[in-house]
Design a protein with these regions (language model features):
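Non-catalytic terminal accessory/regulatory regions of metabolic enzymes
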Residues: 1-78
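C-terminal substrate-recognition/cap domain of FAD-linked oxidoreductases
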Residues: 44, 55-61, 65-89, 271, ...
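FAD-binding subdomain of flavoenzyme oxidoreductases
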Residues: 157-311, 385-391, 396-398, 558
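Activity-critical C-terminal alpha-helical subdomain
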Residues: 530-569
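Glycine-rich N-terminal segment of FAD-binding domains in flavoprotein oxidoreductases
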Residues: 55-63, 68-154, 191
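Alpha-helix capping/hinge segments and adjacent helical runs
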Residues: 514-525, 549-551, 555-559
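A glycine- and small-aliphatic-rich helix-loop capping segment at beta-alpha/alpha-beta transitions
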Residues: 84-85, 136-155, 185-189, 212-220, ...
Length: 569
């Protein structure tokens, strides 16, 4: 386990929690900014006041040394990090904690744990960073199981081997973003996969959930970096061959990527790495409307330029994040390379933006440590320099990396808001604001009508349950055939009814997303929360094949039951 203790609810560590006074000050400012009525800020239920159900099973003697069942460890592994999870944890409601938490030191420990779980009919929940926002790590099981445990991979966090010739690294599944980046930096390399959860999430978790990261185009998901995967299932270990590419039948890698802990515990993977970029160019571009900006982004995505950053923020989100005054959409545009200057690519991209009525400002270029900045964009959001991440263009400063970006102006403000989002969400819960996000992908030809209907459904559902709503959208990733829009819904919460409000909004918007032919998730995964809509999205024969694969590697159905497929009775 980590030396620093995680909060038993919400995001982050115990030693970085804001004081009650700081929470109240932040809450007052947020309520005013959103235009929501002020409410009394509540304090979370302390760990000392938490009461958990008694464990149903205890660790066997031969594994007792790597297992713990104290209140903190059970509570902190009972929930993920969705809005509903944070609300439940905030109020001290941990109805389904794991019976104990196991922290394997090596693969043999994982094997022994799964052997015991299969023999005793105990559910095994792989746990990386616990950052799931879709109900992916809850140890919720029915009476067909004698209990449930969490298997915390924090003890498997090393970069084991680096192949500098092939530019690949063998990394254990429990390595967090900061863990692996710090170790790769010793070799002058980087994975450059920076999801918003980078600080706490793990390589194994990224692979299990098909996480998306730094690059807005081309290499959008973790699977684009996966060379091979190794997992331990109840029936034994399985590992794919290291290959740059293969046409030999269905891919074993792709079966494990996105398996969400149902087919085994991902203990390590070979991933493609690269030198840190030495050439960058970035700029902010304003558009009078989100629709006009979307047309420009479509042109950029189909141009063959492949910008590393191409994220469009609508006026509502720009205003909320203080990167704009609400009168324009903002495009965060950037290029990077470890080999050559990227100014010419930026020149052509800006020409495309100009053809669509975009107004650029705050262009910045750097090559091998030499920065060159030009111009700025003034009113309603200041100058623009490019910031980082959406599902991570640059990791949080606390992550221990050395890369920086221009934090001034509109895009800098948006970047900082992005990095603070998980912490702000905890404050939302304390101040009585409901917060939910919907991320999806759809083809360009259907996007305009789809966007209108999703916005309308989100606003109607939030206003129906809360009386007011703040709904915004941004593109997290873009493809030649369509965007990946990401919708945020904020609304006043009714104390004591937050989870019911959240569920009503979740269902209303998810229904529209699936009915319109979009995906229920682009990068948050399925978990338990998205199961009803995922079941409708996937073909029935594929569902049957997936059940067959699970039966082959997990015949007792102990691996994360209820996720992706129904548990066996």
């Amino acid at each position: 386990m980590n030396a620093r203790r995680r909060k038993h609810w919400g995001w982050g560590f115990e030693d970085e929690q804001p004081s009650p006074e700081e929470v109240r000050a932040a809450a007052g400012g947020l309520a005013t900014h959103l235009g929501f009525p002020p409410v009394e800020v509540e304090d979370p239920v302390s760990l000392e006041a938490v009461r958990l159900p008694a464990p149903r099973v205890v660790a066997p003697a031969e594994l007792a040394g790597i297992c713990a069942a104290d209140v903190h460890v059970r509570a902190s592994h009972a929930l993920g990090k969705s809005y509903s999870d944070v609300v439940l944890g905030f109020r001290g409601h941990f109805e389904h904690p794991p019976d104990f938490v196991a922290s394997p030191r090596d693969e043999r420990d994982v094997e022994r744990l799964l052997e015991w779980c299969a023999a005793e009919r105990v559910a095994a929940i792989p746990y990386g960073g616990g950052t799931s926002v879709v109900g992916g790590v809850q140890p919720v099981v029915d009476s067909n199981y004698n209990g449930a445990i969490s298997i915390d991979l924090a003890g498997l966090r090393q970069v084991v081997e680096v192949d500098e010739v092939s530019r690949a690294a063998r990394i254990q599944g429990g390595a967090t973003g900061p863990d692996l980046e710090a170790q790769l930096a010793e070799h002058g390399l980087t994975l450059r996969h920076f999801p918003q959860s980078f600080e706490l999430s793990t390589l194994g978790g990224w692979i299990a959930t098909r996480a998306a990261g730094h690059f807005a185009t081309v290499w959008t998901h973790i699977e684009d970096f996966v060379e091979s995967v190794r997992a331990i299932a109840p029936t034994g270990a399985w590992e794919s061959r290291r290959l740059p590419g293969s046409g030999a039948g269905p891919s074993p890698d792709r079966l494990l990527v996105g398996s969400e802990g149902t087919l085994g515990v991902i203990t390590e993977a070979w991933v493609r790495v690269q030198p840190r970029p030495t050439h960058r160019a970035s700029v902010g571009v304003r558009f009078p409307t989100f629709a006009i900006g979307a047309e420009c982004v479509r042109a950029l995505s189909q141009s063959g330029l492949h910008p590393s950053n191409c994220r469009l923020i609508d006026p509502a989100e720009a205003r909320f994040t203080m990167s704009g005054d609400g009168t324009f959409a903002l495009l965060v545009l950037g290029f990077e390379s470890c080999d050559h200057p990227v100014g010419l690519s930026m020149d052509r991209a800006l020409a495309i933006c100009a053809e669509h009525g975009g107004l650029a400002g705050g262009r910045r270029e750097s090559s091998e440590g030499r920065d060159r900045s030009r111009g700025g964009v003034g009113a309603g959001g200041g100058g623009t320099g490019v910031g980082g991440p959406k599902k991570g263009d640059a990791p949080p400063a606390r992550a221990g990396t050395t890369e920086t970006s221009d934090a001034g102006g509109g895009i800098g403000a948006w970047r900082e808001a992005f990095l603070r989002a998980p912490y702000v969400r905890d404050i939302f819960v304390a101040m009585g604001v409901l917060s939910e996000t919907f991320e999806t992908a759809i083809t360009w030809d259907r996007f305009p009508g789809f966007h209108e209907r999703v916005i309308a459904a989100a606003r109607a559902a939030a206003e129906d349950t809360s009386g007011a709503a703040h709904v915004s959208c941004r593109f997290t990733h873009v493809y030649p055939d369509g965007p990946a829009p990401y919708y945020t819904v904020l609304a006043p919460a009714q104390r004591g009814e937050e989870v019911e409000q959240w569920a009503a909004i979740k269902a209303a918007v998810s229904e529209v997303i699936v009915a319109e032919g979009a995906t229920i998730t682009h990068h948050h995964a399925v978990g338990r929360d998205h199961r009803p809509w995922y079941d409708r999205q996937r073909p029935d024969p594929f569902a049957a094949a997936l059940r067959g694969a699970k039966a082959a590697v997990d015949p007792q159905a102990v691996m994360n039951p209820g996720v992706l497929v129904d548990p066996l009775s």
